[in-house]
Amino acid sequence: GVSDALGTRLIWCSEFEPPSEKTPNPTQGAARILAHRFPDVPNLGDMRAINWGSQAEVEVTAVGYPCFTADSLVLTIEGYRPISTLEVGTLVLTHLGRWRPINKVMRRMTGETVLVSAQGSPKIHATPEHPFLIESGEWADAKTLGGQRIVQILPEQGSPIDGSDAYWWMVGRYLADGYCQDRKGRENAGRVTFCIGKHKLQPVLDQVEMAGFHAYVSEERTAYKLAFTRNDFYRNMKIFGRGASEKDIPGHIVASLSTDQAESLLSGYLAGDGCYKPKNGWEAGTTSKALAYSLALVAQKARRVVCSVLVRNPPA
């Protein structure tokens, strides 16, 4: 592409893929494609091993961009999403805390990656040269981050969002214990159901009343079910995901919540899935990775704390 645009001639290329199950031979994958397209151009392999003094001088060097692995989570205006699912136009959070559209996406195979792990943020597998913003305000390569403090950016405060504190408490409770069901034959209509432990019913009913809602209560063997038939509530809750594994909080909502609203949402969630331990403080669980990190942002806004997010596999 660069050669065509500038009218230049390709002298050499450097493409290397360390052996793996998918590419046991370093000449496969992207290197094989280059060999097919440019059969007369030598591939110098691993750039770190090139003897630059023996190579012909060039006027223009074109390089690829550092990458993340496909499952890396990125905060979009709709919530955390795997980077492999993002498209041109998707609004993502920048290092300045602003939502900006993606102008171009790139997919390529890469070899070596390093793991970047920071409290309260998704773990990231990145190429060693990928830049990260650190506490000093400078950018540092991923491979040099040992012991550094990475800056976690919260979105700029958005436009004020509607809803009383009691309403946002119910949103938190929905994220913990709720699900949506469609009404057959009726578009954008449905029912929201909360499953509440029998010893937790009255505090939930108090919040429902304060929010101006009505719930139909039915008793099951181990819990109560609260059914809400208001279609506007159903449509609003669908935004947060229908079932446990799909739950998330859109980024624009995290940005627009006031401190009090964020506290109410967090309190509602903890009332359902939380557990207070005198030694460690509050803990909560979810099967949704995206929701876990979104709640960490809400907690940071509500209580000025940085959460630890841990993965725990159930015993076999």
Each language-model region and where it sits:
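Catalytic palm active-site di-aspartate
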Residues: E15-P18, G89, G268, G281-W282
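A short beta-strand micro-motif
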Residues: S72-I77, V92, V114-A118
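Conserved active-site and SAM-binding loop architecture
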Residues: G1-C67
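Protein maturation boundaries and topogenic segments
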Residues: C67-V88
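Short coil-to-beta-strand transition motifs
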Residues: L93-P101
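Intein-associated homing endonuclease modules of the LAGLIDADG/DOD-type, together
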Residues: H95, V105-P315
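NTP-handling and nucleic-acid-processing catalytic cores
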Residues: I83, V88-G89, I102-K104, T113
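Surface-exposed loop/turn positions
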Residues: S72, E87-T90, H130, R149
